[in-house]
Amino acid sequence: MAAGPVRGLAVAGGGESSESEDDGWEIGYLDRSAQKLKGPLLPEEKNETFKKALTTGDISLVQELLDSGLSVDSSFRYGWTPLMYAASVSNVELVRVLLDRGANASFEKDNQTILITACSARGSEEQILKCVELLLSRNADPNVACRRLMTPIMYAARDGHPQVVALLVAHGAEVNTQDENGYTALTWAARQGHKNVVLKLLELGANKMLQTKDGKTPSEIAKRNKHLEIFNFLSFTLNPLEGKLQQLTKEETICKLLTTDSDKEKDHIFSSYTAFGDLEIFLHGLGLEHMTDLLKERDITLRHLLTMRKDEFTKNGITNRDQQKILAALKELEVEEIKFGELPEVAKLEISGDEFLNFLLKLNKQCGHLITAVQNIISELPVNSHKIVLEWSSPRNFTSVCEELVSNVEDLSEEVCKLKDLIQKLQNERENDPTHIPLMEEVSTWNSRILKRTAVTVCGFGFLLFICKLTFQRK
């Protein structure tokens, strides 16, 4: 069976660049009809014709060249073999022919295996899956890593191929292996936003608590890259998918994971989680999932829960242990407030300078807390509306409140400027007042200067008398 023309570029798999832009292959979109050898060819001509046949996907010409004695594991420029090239463009029929002719499925060049090349190929998942399956059937090792310690499952997860991930695990791929940066397959999937791969890996027992070298978990990596659906899902304390398929046999796993029904099921599971409201997300984050049904039965919203008193907690059947978790979370969410009732009455004329300065410092600190709170909110909000997980009310409500905030901030700025001008005026008048009595600090400074000058003068006279006395004694 002849394969259609190849429409793709020959690139080094796994994101590893070639040592040169010209690796001896014809790069581009080629569509050539099948060719036949017109006569005997020199070895150099055979190699060149072989490369062209591989580039165009001309199966019949490839077979004819192999029949003429050309090695199936011929090493082209920079060490690529025909099978590695065929895998890099996901040409299933070409991969099959080369393997049937004895091509080495375990070949590697500079820690770049053919399986890694296939998993990182540019093509449809269906084509990549078939190529990977052929290579695994010829005992290609799914746990051999490249120079960056990335294994085939990491490349498949990074590029968003859940079925390829499942197939690799079914053939013994380690789910929780980490690369040179501490990334696992789950971390790569979370980083790239591939939710179906995330779910598949969790089913296969991926550890969502493994950290990268800079101390980040997959959920934190997802959050940093604005994949909030994945972040919320991975943040759940309990996960009904975790390790779901670990106890199945190899054959059962392949059958289970390569069916279209499983994809529909996982989409349903994920959508049920991402449809959670703010109450469910809050409870899952605290490990209080068991309270969800209880609160829903009593029509208790998150706003109501966060404003409950001690007696209301008990009345609604919330245990002391759960109460402590909620109260601890509330304490972390609180913004430090100034208790203005404890501050001095600024209007009183007898207020001390220290008290007034303390008031201004606390006011400034409060403004700093408010600025930090707003900055944190801005950094957490998704850039695109389709990434918002929780159900929000009309955006107009938020815009209206923000407009009021801006107005209040402008009013505050105006009042602070008035206060500053008033203080400056008082300071200028005070300095120009002839009846102004210097502060003790100023008086003590002046006295110390006089004392120092007096001491120097006395010492000077003493030294002069000593010189005179010494002179008289010598005479």
UniProtKB/Swiss-Prot annotation:
<keyword id="KW-0221">Differentiation</keyword>
<comment type="function">
    <text>Plays a central role during spermatogenesis by repressing transposable elements and preventing their mobilization, which is essential for the germline integrity. Acts via the piRNA metabolic process, which mediates the repression of transposable elements during meiosis by forming complexes composed of piRNAs and Piwi proteins and governs the methylation and subsequent repression of transposons. Its association with pi-bodies suggests a participation in the primary piRNAs metabolic process.</text>
</comment>
<feature type="domain" description="SAM">
    <location>
        <begin position="272"/>
        <end position="334"/>
    </location>
</feature>
<dbReference type="GO" id="GO:0030154">
    <property type="term" value="P:cell differentiation"/>
</dbReference>
<feature type="region of interest" description="Disordered">
    <location>
        <begin position="1"/>
        <end position="24"/>
    </location>
</feature>
<dbReference type="InterPro" id="IPR013761">
    <property type="entry name" value="SAM/pointed_sf"/>
</dbReference>
<feature type="repeat" description="ANK 6">
    <location>
        <begin position="214"/>
        <end position="243"/>
    </location>
</feature>
<dbReference type="GO" id="GO:0007283">
    <property type="term" value="P:spermatogenesis"/>
</dbReference>
<dbReference type="InterPro" id="IPR042650">
    <property type="entry name" value="Asz1_SAM"/>
</dbReference>
<dbReference type="InterPro" id="IPR002110">
    <property type="entry name" value="Ankyrin_rpt"/>
</dbReference>
<feature type="modified residue" description="Phosphoserine">
    <location>
        <position position="18"/>
    </location>
</feature>
<keyword id="KW-0217">Developmental protein</keyword>
<dbReference type="InterPro" id="IPR036770">
    <property type="entry name" value="Ankyrin_rpt-contain_sf"/>
</dbReference>
<keyword id="KW-0597">Phosphoprotein</keyword>
<protein>
    <recommendedName>
        <fullName>Ankyrin repeat, SAM and basic leucine zipper domain-containing protein 1</fullName>
    </recommendedName>
</protein>
<keyword id="KW-0744">Spermatogenesis</keyword>
<feature type="repeat" description="ANK 4">
    <location>
        <begin position="148"/>
        <end position="177"/>
    </location>
</feature>
<keyword id="KW-0040">ANK repeat</keyword>
<keyword id="KW-0469">Meiosis</keyword>
<dbReference type="Pfam" id="PF12796">
    <property type="entry name" value="Ank_2"/>
</dbReference>
<dbReference type="GO" id="GO:0071546">
    <property type="term" value="C:pi-body"/>
</dbReference>
<feature type="repeat" description="ANK 3">
    <location>
        <begin position="110"/>
        <end position="144"/>
    </location>
</feature>
<dbReference type="GO" id="GO:0010526">
    <property type="term" value="P:transposable element silencing"/>
</dbReference>
<keyword id="KW-0677">Repeat</keyword>
<feature type="modified residue" description="Phosphoserine">
    <location>
        <position position="17"/>
    </location>
</feature>
<dbReference type="Pfam" id="PF13637">
    <property type="entry name" value="Ank_4"/>
</dbReference>
<comment type="subunit">
    <text>Interacts with DDX4, PIWIL1, RANBP9 and TDRD1.</text>
</comment>
<dbReference type="GO" id="GO:0031047">
    <property type="term" value="P:regulatory ncRNA-mediated gene silencing"/>
</dbReference>
<dbReference type="Pfam" id="PF07647">
    <property type="entry name" value="SAM_2"/>
</dbReference>
<feature type="repeat" description="ANK 5">
    <location>
        <begin position="181"/>
        <end position="210"/>
    </location>
</feature>
<keyword id="KW-0943">RNA-mediated gene silencing</keyword>
<feature type="repeat" description="ANK 1">
    <location>
        <begin position="45"/>
        <end position="74"/>
    </location>
</feature>
<keyword id="KW-0963">Cytoplasm</keyword>
<feature type="modified residue" description="Phosphoserine">
    <location>
        <position position="20"/>
    </location>
</feature>
<feature type="repeat" description="ANK 2">
    <location>
        <begin position="78"/>
        <end position="107"/>
    </location>
</feature>
<dbReference type="InterPro" id="IPR001660">
    <property type="entry name" value="SAM"/>
</dbReference>
<dbReference type="GO" id="GO:0007140">
    <property type="term" value="P:male meiotic nuclear division"/>
</dbReference>
